[in-house]
């Protein structure tokens, strides 16, 4: 769940500014996951252990950003995993990217924000060379971050953590699939990775759902993983409050996507809601199942999912016993036995206009009360909107990764830090991030900030054009 239209604008600016960049060589067109037989598991897969590789292949990766990014090799892995419950077997795919200067004992699980339900939005498809142009500009934009992490020498594993049904916002499913993507990557013999490989998980916005739940579930689900840290921000830690916050607002399309994801993962919810949806509601869920973020946000701004036009007795959507039971299991930090064991760096803008700050802070505090070592950084500056925060805070994320990978000590217990703007932190310059900070400033100058006002303005313009037409 993220403000996206300004990111599309930013991506276009990148492309216009880099017309001299290397042109990617053409190769065969990849197929979307719903049409590619690679994604169909072989017989007997249900009996395998989670994290087991079912098949793998080499792929060509193209980063649709400033310039072609060099990498040594890339693979896709189909692996056995679990849905929301461990006894619900499923499969999904992760994309593994190995940099030229790969450090064979360091791995980053990068849970990119997909925030949509369409098959062609899956990272394993979008990341491939010659995937449909700009099928998901949001993911294409986030690949700007990939190059920075790859430059550190860290191998990346990027899972399709929403699974074959693309169950966006089904946090427990996403957590399991992210963890099993790590296990599958460690099991890929071509990489020669040790079981003691140091692993860090990262995610922002919709990607932080997968990362936050992976951090919560890993100690019991895959306790032997050598997790040395988790870092995530803009976190929808409480799905109920997030849906209520999104509802009726500019990014309301993400609420529609979230409802579709929950319906598609939980049969009890599907059985309850399907005969209550209006024609408009059914059409909305069908639409998001076929489209990616930009199309969804443009199609459903200001939509009220709690209205009678969406479903009969719409106000009951989030308050019915069935929905409350399911949504109650999707709140981070509630159960003491689901507390991250590895160090956590969590960050959130105080003025985040998309994801409620309070819910994220509450989850972090509860984790701390349950024994987690967690630094929660609150950004108070007026330029810190939901979308701008991820990019502006990239230096601190990289610093956290470097320190965890090198074994430096971390805080004990819970600590709350207040910062105006991360790029104004003297530590960013002192740690050698001055060049990266300048690049970030130049990239977002006059494009984001002030509550991501540009994103809101563009959606309002789109809405007016639709009314006129």
Curated annotation (Swiss-Prot):
Glycan-bearing residues: 238
Intrachain disulfide bonds: 121-292
Catalysed conversion reaction: a triacylglycerol + H2O = a diacylglycerol + a fatty acid + H(+); a monoacylglycerol + H2O = glycerol + a fatty acid + H(+); a diacylglycerol + H2O = a monoacylglycerol + a fatty acid + H(+)
Lineage of the organism: Eukaryota, Fungi, Dikarya, Basidiomycota, Ustilaginomycotina
PROSITE patterns associated with the record: PROKAR_LIPOPROTEIN
Signal peptide span: 1-21
Protein name: Secreted triacylglycerol lipase LIP3
GO annotation, cellular component aspect: extracellular region
Localization per record: Secreted
Active-site residues from the entry: 205, 352, 386
